[in-house]
Amino acid sequence: MCKVFENVNTGGVPLTVFELVTATYATRDFDLRKDWVQCRNTICGFGDTLRTDLFDGIDETTFLTTVCLYTSYLNKQSGKTNTVSCKKKDVLGLPYESYIANRDVVLSGFKIAKEFLLRDQCVFRQRDLPYTTQLIPLAAICAVLGKSKCNEPNTIKTLSRWYWCGILGEMYGGANETRYAYDIEDMVEEVNGRPNAMHTINSAVFSSTRLLTLQTRLSAAYKGIMALLYKEKCRDFMNNTTIDIVNSMLESPDIHHIFPEAYCEKMGIKRERYNSIINKTPILPATNRSIGGNAPSEYLGAILKKVDGLTENELQARVESHFINYAELKADDFNGYFIDRAKSLLNLIEKAMNKPVTDRDAENTLDQFGASLA
């Protein structure tokens, strides 16, 4: 019945997958919509002692798709099916019995996934989450492995590499159902030390010139690189704060220019350069106000005067925690600083993906940067 009436209802309004499954489960005297409200409260952590909005963007279809992916994986493992699949038709056909049997373990998978992101990846807020779509395989993988296995160092290392390859390789921007199936099979096998194709890890590529086109937080890779800076314990220039789950909620750092926009415009620096992620970093509001539109040499001096007891050596350490060359910044040497920071960000990306950026000295890189990034 669901498949027949998938496209229109009696009013001619398209029905969502969730509405169709809700109608099917209603024949079993089960209110899926009411159940989803309870599931959403659990996923979002309403009532938690320390709650962030990280998972507030997860909707009912995302949750159903995750339950379907987990169920399909179990079915293949038990020999009931030959493939893992969570496409629209599979979600529509998710049996009521399977939903009831697997819902709670998938909810636990989301909880484990949230801990993984908050604790291990320094992704704290919904606005900083690179992909909501990647949470589907992540939660399903965590549900299969369980909390104890997910907390093992080798598991964290394996899942971290997969997670960052997916983000920095920008692998989850389109139709992803086939990738989800690869991911759950590959990662469970990899964690358990068995051969697998590692589709997402092996397919992920980061190009050096992508740094120039990462200009806004609309990009997953842009958000990802900022999270990597948090993960590396970058410290605020003025108050020395590192960004953790508590500070991200209390002080809400934002992403600002290192060489200020007004200064760059005055100096004739191209927007393609000064507005790229290479010239941006997480900064607290008070520090950003102190920076203003001034040259770095001016605002560094102003910060030293403003913060009691702050030595230049300490300020240098704070600045360099953002992978910024302090000497070049203090000298207002935009070109030297820009190339140096591009290299440092590529090093950070290579570390997260555990694979090399292969075009650091390619002709296209040389053309666009005017120097090798090797």
Per-segment meaning from a language model:
Residues S276-D308:
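Short Cys/His-centered divalent metal-binding micro-motifs
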Residues M1-K3, S78-G79, K149-N151, M171-Y172, ...:
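Short conserved micro-motifs at the rims of enzyme active sites and ligand-binding pockets
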Residues M1-E60, L64-L74, R125, P153, ...:
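Basic- and aromatic-enriched surface patches that contact anionic nucleotides/nucleic acids
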